[in-house]
């Protein structure tokens, strides 16, 4: 990645590093500069903005977060569209959250730019509950780091084990001297 100042016309394709407010113009951090943004910047009298550009071999924070989130997702889990480098994972059904803790540690050990956080293992969850998040700290990472995190996930680092109704029986033995109220 390369950071640096640019005129609005030179900024096309770059991503804003900071939120920019100039009069009625507001460009949020992470906005990709296109022709419409250049026109708005010029109208607002902005001469220079700081942008980041991905280099050959880099992937954007959203692409990386989405890829890693898909890799960790197992049965009973859905992934929200990645935004600002974050992909949130949700329970698609009620059940118990089962996590491969070693896979979580492997993913987090790939690089400090990649973070994977989950609820505690074996926690009961309900449908729609957020159970984990993948977050990329910088605006992008090298594709090889994303690929290493995907590989570290294995074949789904987490899943929701559904609740299953089972039949049970009770065998009760009456012993001499046992009070009847204990059995009732």
Residue ranges and their predicted role:
Residues 20-28, 143-150, 168-174:
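Short, mixed-charge, low-aromatic patches
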Residues 55-163:
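Extended, charged alpha/beta regions that create polyanion-binding interfaces
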